[in-house]
UniProtKB/Swiss-Prot annotation:
InterPro entries: Lipid/polyisoprenoid-bd_YceI, TTHA0802/YceI-like_sf, UPF0312/YceI
UniProt cross-references to NCBIfam families, sorted A to Z: PRK03757.1
Pfam families: YceI
Organism of origin: Pseudomonas entomophila (strain L48)
Name this protein carries in UniProt: UPF0312 protein PSEEN5043
Length: 192
């Protein structure tokens, strides 16, 4: 009886360990320009200002058999914002908006991933920005995974969300500019 119990326990442990081993760790490839954190905000209700954050880092775990077990963490330097207009960038970075001297970083850490289709999911997590942490849900799309030409393995995703700036204590420049659209595109390199 003891042998059967031990064998069952060993098999169970092996199966659990195998399941945990399937999730792989990926480092977001920002060095090769294969990852972007882009934003868009209304300009007076007439057009949109587009920009990006140039300095960020992050990682994620991914198992295509268990997408719900995935996790992601992204840190970005708020002073790295760029909108192709130096004076506007200075103004956005100032105390009037992001106050990057007081709040130099923003961070997103996922708390849950819920599949919504074959290649789509809702990724919910805590976004800390401007000294405020709020739950945010991104609509994510799995783009694909596989080997790269350099002998590594990669996986790629896009994710979008809309933020209400007032929720983070940031006053937009007017009633038409209280929401910010975020569009994140990442390609991760599997870590060995």
């Amino acid at each position: 009886m003891l042998k059967k119990t031990f064998a069952a326990l060993a098999l169970g442990t092996a199966l659990i360990s195998a399941g945990q081993a399937m999730a792989a760790e990926y480092k977001i490839d920002k060095e090769g320009q294969h990852a972007f954190v882009d934003w868009k905000i209304s300009h007076l209700g007439y057009s949109f200002i587009h920009g990006t954050f140039k300095d960020f880092d992050g990682n994620f775990t991914w198992d295509s058999a268990k997408p719900e077990a995935s996790k992601i963490s992204v840190d970005l330097k708020t002073a790295s914002l760029w909108s192709n207009h130096a004076e506007r960038d200075k103004h956005i970075a100032s105390k009037d908006f992001l106050d990057v001297k007081k709040y130099p970083e923003a961070k997103f850490v996922s708390t849950s991933v819920k599949s919504t289709g074959d290649k789509t999911a809702d990724v919910t997590g805590d976004l800390t920005m401007h000294g405020v942490t709020k739950p945010v849900t991104f609509k994510a799309v799995f783009n694909g995974e596989g080997k790269d030409p350099w002998g590594g393995e990669r996986a790629g995703f896009n994710a979008t969300t809309t933020l209400n700036l007032n929720d983070f204590g940031i006053k937009g420049p007017g009633a038409t500019s209280q929401t910010l659209d975020l569009d994140i595109s990442v390609e991760g390199v599997k870590q060995k």
